[in-house]
Amino acid sequence: FERLSILGADALVEALDRIEAGEAEFEPQDESRVTLAPKLRKSDGVLDFSENSAAVERHVRAMPTWPGARTTLPGGRDLVVLEARPVSPGSLGNEDVAASPGTLLDEAPFPVRTGDGAVRLGRVKPAGKAAMDGEAFLRGARGARGDTLGT
């Protein structure tokens, strides 16, 4: 991301300089090479904790607005995940490694078991509420070790 933002900024400055100098050559887009992305559905945002930690984290980053990376809490309430970070597999205990994907491994700082390790849910947005820190959410929701998300 950082590297691309620098390259993009440089390309933008170069393009603006060429336009200002009257040297820019405008070329219409070749419509035969157009590709279209399918419309996103709410179901496209559903997190699959059986995926590896990197895939879960990428899914969260890919869905920042609509449809949002989402899972369900015990009881069926929706939880939108706004930030997730992989947890080092070496930091998992034997009991954590044996847990099934989607299992809450501890009350804080909100680690959830994935297919190959765990992710820490940093910011979340419960249905009908404002976004908040994952740990603050767990304190209020009384989340407990062993609860399973996404069921």
Predicted regions and their residues:
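Glutamine-centric residue-chemistry signal
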Residues: 25-30, 125
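A generic "alpha-helical surface" signal
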Residues: 2-6, 10, 38, 54, ...
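Generic alpha-helical structural context detector
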Residues: 2, 14-17, 38, 58-61, ...
